[in-house]
Amino acid sequence: MKTLVVDAYDSFVYILVEYLKQLDMNPIVYRINEINIALIEELSPDMILLGPGPGHPKDAGYTEIIHRFKGQIPILGVCLGHQAIGLAFDCKISKACNLRHGKKSLITNDQQCIFQHFDSPCLVTRYHSLIIDKEGFNNDELIITSN
């Protein structure tokens, strides 16, 4: 399995890369300004990971990738990448009411796919200022798998 990791200039992406290596997911890393649709097609990854980074997801450069490969290649977004997926599917991105920079909290999950080996609830460390606002969430293309 080959995993394309798109780095939006955040060092945490390399922790994710190490996890992917441990899972034999063969990560290849490109910075957001080095990647384009043609190169992704040429690389032919089995999965795309859109990494964390600074700023607002509307400015991340991920939207074109999401729209082009949705439904064809599994796409996982972490932090900024997660927010960009929500934005690409017309979800509202809001400032978090309670900032969780480096804070631990319990989340519930559906124990499916990427959560299949996790308890629910499980303890996670969060580091974000923006959220996908679930108030008014009405999207039949996305499924909420954790909360």
List PLM regions with ranges.
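Short gly/ser/thr-rich secondary-structure transition/capping motifs
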Residues: 28-34, 57, 105-108, 127, ...
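N-terminal beta1-alpha1 cap of cysteine-dependent amidohydrolase-like domains
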Residues: 1-71, 80, 140
